[in-house]
């Protein structure tokens, strides 16, 4: 640990193998919380490298509990969190729209770290069982085409990181790594990050981890979602190449709103917002969900433009298919 910490503090990047070995030491309980915290902070101050993200992701994914699903072409749309926007649960709401539109959604998430309500919190408020065994989760996914994978339940190694992250109260490499370690192998991904400087790097990490197509998004003001206001920046992984782009919501058929219009609350309030959106009740929440679901359809390759994805998202919600998908998950992911 001492050599690795000195290397990072001197501004040098760790190799993928060095990070992998250090991560395994943490997973095996060989390092104290103080050592883990100092390492996370040192990495943040230096700036995380692709080799470090990849090495950590591979170690954590290998240590995860596998989900024996029969489905292929799985996708996730989780973000890094840590943007302190206190918005409603955008990607979680959009996941129902994507699943209703024919995308196999392996929604990976956790409880809140820096916000009022994480994806696990809001889904628990909707009656979703976070603690099903892997075999049952696979059955849910195979039947519904959507499942929620609770990170704490499926990543035993996280118990060494979670207390440290809560005490630090700042985004670290763990925020960046969380979306990379879905227990179900992913073919495509929409990943939100609060750091626009990491768009290209993250897309290249996803490429290295085997994604066939992916989109990494940063919204206005560093939100880890596409925003219905201001300028959105994204990196697109397509045909093994990463390209950078930008767009405004108004350019793809979304009514622009303000950040205050999409702020959420505690889990029960956000659960109500989610249901209202899937019921197609007009609001800034609906526009934001349509935008991010549309982006998800584009990231998945189901449509050939963000605008086409937005149109598909509106159709899926207006027909009631997204609300039906919520009811299906509520009926299956129980126990």
UniProtKB/Swiss-Prot annotation:
A GO BP entry: L-tryptophan biosynthetic process
Membrane-crossing segments per the record: none
Pfam family, one: Glycos_trans_3N
Binding site for anthranilate 2: 165
Taxonomic superkingdom: Bacteria
Assembly description: Homodimer.
The protein's role, per its UniProt record: Catalyzes the transfer of the phosphoribosyl group of 5-phosphorylribose-1-pyrophosphate (PRPP) to anthranilate to yield N-(5'-phosphoribosyl)-anthranilate (PRA).
Name the record gives this protein: Anthranilate phosphoribosyltransferase
Organism: Lactococcus lactis subsp. lactis (strain IL1403)
């Amino acid at each position: 640990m001492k050599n690795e910490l000195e290397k990072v503090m001197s501004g040098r990047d760790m190799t993928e193998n060095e990070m992998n070995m250090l991560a395994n030491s943490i997973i095996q309980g060989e390092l104290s919380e103080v050592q883990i915290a100092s390492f996370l902070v040192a990495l943040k101050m230096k700036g995380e490298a692709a080799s470090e993200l990849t090495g950590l992701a591979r170690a954590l994914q290998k240590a995860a509990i596998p989900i024996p699903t029969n489905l292929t072409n799985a996708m996730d749309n989780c973000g890094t969190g840590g943007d302190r926007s206190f918005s409603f649960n955008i990607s979680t709401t959009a996941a129902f729209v994507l699943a209703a539109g024919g995308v196999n959604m392996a929604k990976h998430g956790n409880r809140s770290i820096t916000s009022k309500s994480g994806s696990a919190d809001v889904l628990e408020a909707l009656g979703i069982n976070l603690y099903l065994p892997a075999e049952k989760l696979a059955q849910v996914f195979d039947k519904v085409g959507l499942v929620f994978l609770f990170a704490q339940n499926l990543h035993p190694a996280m118990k060494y990181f979670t207390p440290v992250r809560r005490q630090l109260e700042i985004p670290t490499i763990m925020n960046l790594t969380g979306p990379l370690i879905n227990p179900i192998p992913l073919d495509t991904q929409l990943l939100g990050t609060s750091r626009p400087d990491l768009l290209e790097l993250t897309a290249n990490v996803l490429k290295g981890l085997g994604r066939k197509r992916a989109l990494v998004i940063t919204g206005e003001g560093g939100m880890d979602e596409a925003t219905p206001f201001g300028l959105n920046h994204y990196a697109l992984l397509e045909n093994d190449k990463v390209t950078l782009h930008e767009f405004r919501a108004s350019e793809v058929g979304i009514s622009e709103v303000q950040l205050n219009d999409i702020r959420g609350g505690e889990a029960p309030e956000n659960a109500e917002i989610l249901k209202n959106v899937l019921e197609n009740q007009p609001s800034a929440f609906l526009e934001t969900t349509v935008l991010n679901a549309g982006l998800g359809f584009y990231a998945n390759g189901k449509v050939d433009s963000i605008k086409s994805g937005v149109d598909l998202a509106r159709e899926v919600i207006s027909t009631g298919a997204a609300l039906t998908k919520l009811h299906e998950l509520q009926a299956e992911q129980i126990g």
